[in-house]
Curated annotation (Swiss-Prot):
UniProt keyword annotations, A-Z: Amino-acid biosynthesis, Cytoplasm, Diaminopimelate biosynthesis, Lysine biosynthesis, NAD, NADP, Oxidoreductase
Domain of life, per lineage: Bacteria
Pfam families noted in UniProt: DapB_C, DapB_N
Gene3D superfamilies xrefs: Dihydrodipicolinate Reductase, domain 2 (3.30.360.10), NAD(P)-binding Rossmann-like Domain (3.40.50.720)
Protein name: 4-hydroxy-tetrahydrodipicolinate reductase
Binding site for NAD(+): G12, A13, G14, G15, R16, M17, E38, G102, T103, T104, A126, A127, N128, F129
Organism: Salmonella newport (strain SL254)
Length: 273
């Protein structure tokens, strides 16, 4: 067994992403699976987390109480729902635990709670933990600065039928990257739906389109369209393991941080490019 540099706890251990995170934690050099959590009353409580994830016996039992495992982890990884994540955030803030947050769908109050907690603990909060997606966000900033003022900009995203929020957190991050590069606020220029007689496209807006179907892991395209040409920048994920590995990489990166709010671009050093 490799020597652990960081011990992690995984929220939502029985979910699609939770199982991928457990597999990644058990396989990644420098990481130790310290705890796995499920909601109270879950039929999965008492299971071996590794066996649950199809990764072999881990010796870590799935539990519902953070209090019971507070001494077993350094960083808490959460890809669940906003209400649950905020409960976990309060606990980690109280006990000085770092967090990696991949949950999407937070309202403004939830985002503010994360910002406030980051004054005391270190948090990596990102809409997407894929290396490729975060490289794409950097490319979008550069494309927007060159083409954004004279292009019609549309963002199209597709996910599996079980995803509960729309647009996806990644699509919103794409919009924010583009809007920021154009010195705009996404709230002021986003168009999230079109139906019926809409009139002509309003110049300077950023449109969003959402697809929910089948088992699509995640596809995102940003379109910069002008008369006679268009540029499309696309990312397609074929496995959730890319997100899981990015989250574990973030947990390792957090080991030297006392407090602060970071995203994957900080982890990858993309802001220096």
């Amino acid at each position: 067994m490799h020597e652990a540099q960081i011990r992690v706890a995984i929220a939502g251990a029985g979910g699609r992403m939770g199982r991928q995170l457990i597999q990644a934690a058990m396989a990644m050099e420098g990481v130790q699976l310290g705890a796995a959590l499920e909601r109270e009353g879950s039929s999965l409580l008492g299971s071996d987390a590794g066996e649950l994830a199809g990764a072999g016996k881990s010796g870590v039992i799935v539990q519902s109480s953070l209090e019971a495992v507070k001494d077993d982890f350094d960083v808490f990884i959460d890809f669940t729902r906003p209400e649950g994540t905020l409960t976990h955030l309060a606990f980690c803030r109280q006990h000085g635990k770092g967090m990696v947050i991949g949950t999407t769908g937070f309202d403004d109050a939830g985002k503010q709670a994360i910002r406030e907690a980051s004054q005391e603990i270190a948090i990596v909060f990102a809409a997407n933990f894929s290396v490729g997606v975060n490289v794409m966000l950097k490319l979008l900033e550069k494309a927007a600065k060159v083409m954004g003022d004279y292009s019609d900009i549309e963002i199209i995203e597709a996910h599996h039928r079980h995803k509960v929020d729309a647009p996806s957190g990644t699509a919103l991050a794409m919009g924010e990257a583009i809007a920021g590069a154009l010195d705009k606020n996404l709230k002021d220029c986003a168009v999230y739906s079109r139906e019926g007689y809409t009139g002509e496209r309003v110049p300077g807006t950023i449109g969003f389109a959402t697809v929910r179907a089948g088992d699509i892991v995640g596809e995102h395209t940003a379109m910069f369209a002008d008369i006679g040409e268009r540029v499309e920048i696309t990312h397609k994920a074929s496995s959730r393991m890319t997100f899981a590995n990015g989250a574990l990489r973030s947990a390792l990166w957090l080991k030297t941080k006392k407090n602060g709010l970071f995203d994957m671009r900080d982890v990858l050093g993309l802001d220096v490019l």
